[in-house]
Amino acid sequence: MNNIWWQTKGQGNVHLVLLHGWGLNAEVWRCIDEELSSHFTLHLVDLPGFGRSRGFGALSLAEMAEAVLRQAPDKAIWLGWSLGGLVASQIALTHPERVQALVTVASSPCFSARDEWPGIKPDVLAGFQQQLSDDFQRTVERFLALQTMGTETARQDARALKKTVLALPMPEVDVLNGGLEILKTVDLRLPLQNVPMPFLRLYGYLDGLVPRKVVPMLDKLWPHSESYIFAKAAHAPFISHPVEFRHVLVALKQRV
């Protein structure tokens, strides 16, 4: 059986699992892991096929969620960023008893634009898939640059993301392609209406991948959930606004 790379740190009485986004790995959390581990028992995970979790091919969202869950604590707050938000959401849907609270960061239940639903144009995602087979390192770098555009610290945030990618071997092309396929096809808008646990959605006001127009739409669709917008952040608020990000999570811990 292929193993998921998993690191646990901290002594908190609440477990917090952090799931990264497409093309990246758990090193992306190093800007906040020390501070968070003083409040939580923190679990850093490389999603299957990414970072140090080698030996996986392209997986469906359900397969990815099951692979991660095998090594997870019995109960935890699950936090997923971007693609990781879909994985955390899938776990909340299929194993709600394992999820103390669900937190999605710069994530959408449906990343792809649909009728009357803002998102990434499907042909843009298809274009990324096509470019992966031509020059996949450059394609990943382009995707990362999109994530920080517009912030006051865009250049240094983009450098931090690129450093995270280059710190470890690149994922296989079919793994990257499978992740884009999830972003292109998955739609959890209706299933997530019924999750029973506390549900916090975090957004960057300047995010170019998850338009802020989805926030009031999901507030209405999921009235049991809460939303919070980082006013000057783009797609990676934990990198651009680590202190504010930590405060939001510590406040959540006190409520659950």
Swiss-Prot record:
GO terms for cellular component: cytoplasm. GO terms for molecular function: pimelyl-[acyl-carrier protein] methyl ester esterase activity. The active site is at S82 (nucleophile), D207, H235. Pathway: Cofactor biosynthesis; biotin biosynthesis. Its main location: cytoplasm. Its EC number is 3.1.1.85. One of its GO terms (biological process) is biotin biosynthetic process. Belongs to the AB hydrolase superfamily. Carboxylesterase BioH family. Monomer. The physiological role of BioH is to remove the methyl group introduced by BioC when the pimeloyl moiety is complete. It allows to synthesize pimeloyl-ACP via the fatty acid synthetic pathway through the hydrolysis of the ester bonds of pimeloyl-ACP esters. This is Pimeloyl-[acyl-carrier protein] methyl ester esterase. It comes from Escherichia coli O157:H7. The lineage of its organism: Bacteria, Pseudomonadati, Pseudomonadota, Gammaproteobacteria, Enterobacterales. The gene is bioH.
